[in-house]
Each structure stands twice: as C-alpha cells, then as structure tokens.
Regions:
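C-terminal catalytic-base region of ester-bond hydrolases, centering on the histidine
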Residues: 192-290
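Serine-dependent carboxylesterase/thioesterase catalytic core
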Residues: 35, 80-182, 233
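Active-site catalytic motif of lipid deacylating hydrolases and related acyltransferases
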Residues: 23-98
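Solvent-exposed loop/turn segments at secondary-structure junctions
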Residues: 36-40, 70-74, 103-108, 131-135, ...
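Positively charged n-region of N-terminal signal peptides that target proteins for export
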Residues: 1-4
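Bacterial N-terminal signal peptides
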Residues: 8-16
Length: 290
C-alpha cells in the first residue's frame, strides 16, 4: 500500500516479474475500487475495506488503485473528492481511462462524477456492486424515525461526533448522507439528474442473503426489507442494485450479505469468495477490451 497524497490510498501494481504473475485480470485500463458509506479505504482504522481483493487481482495481472474519501457526506462532496483522486491516478499511470468498480455508495457518487463532473471521457467501464440506485428502505426507516421523533439533528450530530472524536474523521454530515440514500431522493432527485453517459459501459451486480446463514449480522435487516422490496443483501435490494447491464445476483450456497460481498467483517461464505469474484469481473472487462 502506498500513499500518493493526502486523501488517496493507492495499490500501485508493479510487476517486476511478469512471468510469475497471472494475466487473466490484466485489463487495458487501471482498475479503481471505490468504497461505500460509513467507511473509507480503512474501516474505522481497524481493517482494510477491500481485504484481499486488491492482492488477488494483482496476482492475476491487474493494476489496482483504491480511492478513499469522506465516509459520511453528500454525493456531490464525495464525487469531487473522487474526481481529484482519479485525475491523480491518470497522471501517475499515463492511462487515458479507468475501470471503476464501486461497492454500495461507491457506485453512486462515482456515477454523479461521471455524469456531472466531466469524468465520462476518463471512465471506460462502470461496475456497481449492490449500490442502492433506487434508494434503501433502511435509509427510509432511519430518516423517518428521526422526523417522527424530532431527533434527526440530534442523531446526526451524535454520529458526526462519533466519527470525529472516536475515529478521527472530520467534515462528516450524516444527515445529508442519510437523506441522499432514501428511496424518494434517489428516484426523484438523483437519478433524473444523473444520466448514463455515452461511451461508458455500465454494469451491475446485486446480492441476496437468502437464509439466516447468509444474512449473518444483517439477518434482521434482510427480513425487514424482504416484504417491501424482495430479495436483498440486508441493506440494498436486488431491484435497487440493478443498473445498466445487470450481471446477476450473488447468493453463494446459503446467501450473501452486504458486508460479505467484499469479505468485510463476515464469516466465510460458502460458495462465494470475494477476491475471486472481483478477479472474474476484471477478467471479463479485459475480454470486453477494457
């Protein structure tokens, strides 16, 4: 792991001995992994957000970079941070474009940057993994609770304090972050103003907890969302995750939750391995000429 500048954590893949590395994930353009809400490239300073995914992709020939931004802010704020980091990546590598893979909210602020911040000429492909393109009932419930009790400001303020005091993250705005994850905001404000751009290949994946074994720590949320939006990963429904060319729903043997999609803070998931899955995404992008 190498820091190029403040605000960006980069996995700059150098292959001094190409013969010792695989090439099936050696895409034409660098791969950029962008994290979701509530964390950055490191989760609360405890563990890497992407775990062994970058290493496995590297071992198969990929050049991988990881962007890192404010975990709780508006889409616009995060998009500006992301744009600056991608521009730096392009300058360092000399590449003309990148392949973007975003998990959860990482598939939303990147969409905004591509559509509204002039980044479409620099993005060859866009892949979202369980991104709430049509919002999440979980965000609806949290924001409605705050409105009903009149505690929205207090709850958001407490969360901002936690991020700042306990985890050293400044400049968060949990209230606007939460609002911009609701189904109403995504459907009526975000999507109409964030059109897909010509020249960018869009694809997506979703996931389903499927069983209590797959749900793990997110089982309660999975069960709560199921009657409302059907199959879901404990935060994002399959119907909300679909964008562009939908490549399928990840389930493993017993189900996959929002965290186990990237192997984060979860028990082993039978029938699914996150590093292997992301490497397959890269291999497919390579086959498509990206």
């Amino acid at each position: 792991m190498k820091k190029i500048s403040v605000g960006i954590i980069v996995f700059l893949i150098v292959l001094p001995m190409v013969s010792m590395a695989g090439t099936k994930a050696a895409t034409k353009y660098p791969i950029v992994l962008s994290h979701g809400m509530g964390a950055n490239a490191e989760v609360m300073g405890i563990t890497d957000y992407w775990g062994n995914i970058p290493k496995t992709m590297r071992n198969n020939g990929a050049q991988v970079f990881i962007t890192s931004g404010n975990p709780m802010q508006s889409k616009e704020y995060k998009a500006i941070e992301w744009k600056a980091q991608v521009q730096e990546i392009l300058a360092i590598t000399g590449a003309q474009k990148i392949n973007l893979i975003g998990h959860s909210d990482g598939g939303l602020y990147t969409r905004y940057a591509i559509s509204n911040l002039g980044m479409s000429p620099y993005v060859a492909s866009y892949t979202s993994m369980s991104s709430p393109h049509r919002g999440s009932p979980v965000a609806d419930a949290i924001m409605n609770l705050g409105t009903t009790t009149g505690l929205t400001d207090a709850i958001a303020g407490a969360l901002d304090f936690v991020y700042g005091f306990l985890f050293g993250v400044s400049g968060t705005d949990c209230e606007i972050n939460g609002t911009q994850e609701t189904t109403w905001w995504m459907k009526t404000v975000f999507n109409p103003n964030v059109p897909d751009m010509a020249g960018v290949y869009y694809q997506s994946y979703g996931a389903d907890c499927k069983t209590v074994i797959g749900g793990q720590v997110m089982t309660a949320l999975w069960l709560a969302i199921k009657p409302i939006e059907g199959a879901n990963d404990g935060l994002v429904s399959v119907s909300s995750a679909k964008w562009g060319n939908y490549r399928g729903t990840l389930t493993g043997w017993f189900g996959i939750n929002h965290l186990s999609e990237i192997g984060l803070l979860s028990l082993p998931t039978l029938g699914y391995d996150a590093p292997t899955h992301f490497t397959k995404i890269a291999a497919d992008l390579k086959a498509r000429g990206f």
